[in-house]
């Protein structure tokens, strides 16, 4: 009830309701409550990479019917369902070095970044390809049309993106994949 009140107020104020980072039940509550188009600011297709953060086909269709937009998330684990296993194996292989870095007091993610940089070829090889990201794009376009797909990247919150898409400077690679 409180959430529905908040969504109603957001609609009145012209605020966009973002359905990324919410559970499936909350997603449906939001879609059924809002009177304005929603955005999934950084989500992918569950049918291609079945992780709970990605949207199922009926959710994708609901966003399209609502007039909303789904913006692709570049996080490797939301693009390729095998990434997590490959990443864990990479971290296990280099656990001694990671542990040594952690013992110095640096933050865990920074230690992983340092090891990934040190073993660049190996760390890049476990990342998904741009083509795998494009499978999400193509799938969403087939379900709801090109006017409902955008780029969300999530560069400010991720530590791994597809090969060739490490920063915004790599967007031309994404553009080439679209052509």
Regions found by a protein language model. Give the residues of each.
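Active-site beta-loop-alpha junctions enriched in small/polar residues
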Residues: 15, 20-27, 43-46, 73-77, ...
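The substrate-binding groove and active-site-proximal loops of carbohydrate-active enzymes
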Residues: 16, 46-51, 120-128
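Active-site loop ensemble at the mouth of alpha/beta enzyme cores that anchors a bound cofactor
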Residues: 53-55, 84-93
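Short acidic/histidine-rich active-site segments
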Residues: 72-74, 144-165
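Histidine/acidic residue-rich metal-binding segments in metalloenzymes
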Residues: 1-18, 22-39, 52-68, 131-147
